[in-house]
C-alpha cells in the first residue's frame, strides 16, 4: 500500500479548495471559524467537516477523480475482497473505490435498514448510544476488507464496523477516511485497538 502524504495534501487542497473557490465570499469567515475549537462537542465539530456539505467539491469532476485515485492507488495491490462503507456518508466514496478496484461493496448500515438476517453492534455517542448492522452473509472468514468513511471523529462507528466484520471472520486490513479530526481522539483509539488507518487530510483543533 502506498503512503504518499504529499499527494494526499495535494488532494486535500484540490478537494476543499473547490468548495472555497465557489464560495469566495465565505472563505475568510470559514477560515476564522474553522481555526477555533467547537464549543458544542464532537457531533457538531464533525458536522462542520461533513463532506456532503462541500457539495461544490463533490460536483467537481477533477476533485472527485483525484480523491478516488488516492484510495485506489493505496489499495490496488492490497488483494482486497471488499470495500465496506459506513452509513451514511461512507457510501459517497466507498462504492466508487470498490468499482475501481473490481471488488465487492459491503454496506454497514444504521439499525433497521437492512432486509435480511444481520449482526448488530452498538457504540457510545456523546449523549446515548447508536447501533449499526451488517448482513450475516456479507463476507466469509478470511475475506480482506477495508472500511471507508468520510470522517473519523470519536471513532465509534468505525470501531463498530471493525467488530462486525471481524465477527464474520473477515480480516480488516485498514480503516480509511477523507478527514481525521485527531483532537477528538478517534484515530488514536482505533490505532490502539489494532486498526491501521489512512486519511487524506486532518484538521487539528476540534
UniProtKB/Swiss-Prot annotation:
Pfam families: Pribosyltran (PF00156). PROSITE patterns: PUR_PYR_PR_TRANSFER. Transmembrane segments: none annotated. This is Adenine phosphoribosyltransferase. It comes from the Bacteria. It catalyses: AMP + diphosphate = 5-phospho-alpha-D-ribose 1-diphosphate + adenine. Belongs to the purine/pyrimidine phosphoribosyltransferase family. Its EC number is 2.4.2.7. Homodimer. Catalyzes a salvage reaction resulting in the formation of AMP, that is energically less costly than de novo synthesis. One of its GO terms (biological process) is AMP salvage. The keyword Cytoplasm applies. It is found in: Cytoplasm. One of its GO terms (cellular component) is cytoplasm. The keyword Coiled coil does not apply. Keywords: Cytoplasm, Glycosyltransferase, Purine salvage, Transferase. GO terms for molecular function: adenine phosphoribosyltransferase activity. Pathway: Purine metabolism; AMP biosynthesis via salvage pathway; AMP from adenine: step 1/1.
